[in-house]
Amino acid sequence: RTEQLAIMKNAQFIVQPSLCEGWGTVLEDAKVLNKVVLLSNIPVHQEQQNKKCVLFDPHDPKQLAETIARTAERASLPEHEAEYAGDMEQGIANMYREAREYSRALERVFL
């Protein structure tokens, strides 16, 4: 797990090509690291995604290859360096913000 997180921290972006997931911890780790994530377009990823996620058809390898190429090209541009660098402090702040929003939504429904 430590090695996996170190690799993710130093990656320009993460690819999660699953056909089936319960609740993807790779995506949650990537969100904390504030990384761009390419996700297979499956229900759990639709639910978990944030602004830094890009969905692709998990049954279309050509689309995945094109999405990876486009993302790698964008990540190599100096004007997008910060977007792909990842910032754990910002990622944690985003998670806290999302948790507060979720908590408020629950309060509106149940209180």
List each language-model region with its residue ranges.
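Short alpha-helical donor nucleotide-sugar binding micro-motif in glycosyltransferases
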Residues: R1, A6-A11
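Short alpha-helical segment that forms part of, or immediately flanks, the ligand-binding pocket
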Residues: L5, L27-V32, P43-E47
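Short hydrophobic beta-strand element within catalytic cores of glycosyltransferases
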Residues: F13, V32, V36-L39
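Aromatic "clamp/platform" in nucleotide-sugar-dependent glycosyltransferases that forms part
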Residues: L19
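Conserved acidic donor-binding segment of nucleotide-sugar-dependent glycosyltransferases
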Residues: V54-P61, T71-A75
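C-terminal alpha-helical cap of glycosyltransferases
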Residues: A69, I92-L111
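Conserved donor-nucleotide binding/catalytic region of nucleotide-linked donor-dependent transferases
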Residues: R70-Q90
